[in-house]
């Protein structure tokens, strides 16, 4: 019976989050999450949505219909990040929301796109091997790395230094992240603008 199989599937998805769902002391909203530490992680309902629709489930469509500020953008990013397998991800959004979507990817997307971590500048030193390694690791064109004479790379062994970077460095890093996101995501503006 398909209904019985579906119920078992849903129960299996909810099981890891049972304690989070029953915790009434946890008063986190999309507006307050990450305010103390600057680090953003998915909320429980976003994790459930991410686990419901991914490469390993038979479902390929989902309508997210929540109120304003409930985390729909981060939910859609979590789904997209869970579905990536080397192919481009297509995002359909009004032109007016494209910049917001890019900034949200930097907050709740793949760790490589997040600004709040330790960043170190790696100079290419006109070395083709360094350029190729950076290109592969960051999914950036070699021309981009040559033009900028290097690239930003994360160091997961050190603490967040983003707020210590100069304004010029932050701009350079954000331009690189935008380029990396543009290489992974294709934006289509459904209002034609």
Kindly give the residue locations of the regions a language model identified.
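Short loop/turn elements that form and flank the Walker-type P-loop nucleotide-binding site
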Residues: 58, 85-86, 181
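Helicase-associated low-complexity/disordered flanking segments
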Residues: 1-37
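Conserved pre-motif I regulatory segment
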Residues: 25-65
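Residue-level preference for the first positions of well-ordered beta-strands
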Residues: 61-63, 88-90, 184-185
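Conserved RecA-like ASCE ATPase "motif II neighborhood" in helicase/translocase motors
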Residues: 167-171, 180-193
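Conserved Walker A/P-loop ATP-binding site and its immediately adjacent core
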Residues: 70-160
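Short His-Asn-centered micro-motif
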Residues: 65-67, 92-95, 188-190
């Amino acid at each position: 019976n398909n209904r019985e199989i579906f119920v078992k599937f849903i129960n299996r998805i909810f099981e890891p989050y049972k304690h989070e769902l029953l915790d009434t002391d946890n008063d986190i909203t999309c507006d307050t999450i990450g305010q103390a530490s600057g680090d953003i992680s998915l909320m429980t309902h976003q994790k459930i949505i991410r686990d419901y629709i991914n490469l390993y489930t038979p479902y390929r469509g989902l309508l997210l219909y929540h109120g304003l500020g409930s985390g729909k953008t981060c939910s859609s990013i979590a789904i997209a990040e869970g579905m990536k397998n080397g192919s481009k991800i297509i995002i359909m959004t009004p032109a007016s929301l494209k910049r917001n979507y890019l900034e949200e990817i930097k907050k709740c997307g793949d760790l490589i796109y997040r600004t709040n971590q330790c960043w170190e500048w790696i100079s290419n030193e006109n070395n083709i091997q360094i350029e190729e390694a950076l290109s592969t690791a960051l999914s950036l064109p070699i021309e981009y790395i040559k033009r900028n004479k290097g690239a930003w790379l994360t160091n997961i062994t050190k603490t967040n230094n983003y707020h210590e970077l100069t304004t010029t460095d932050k701009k350079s890093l954000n331009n690189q992240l935008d380029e990396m996101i543009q290489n992974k995501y294709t934006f289509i503006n459904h209002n034609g603008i």
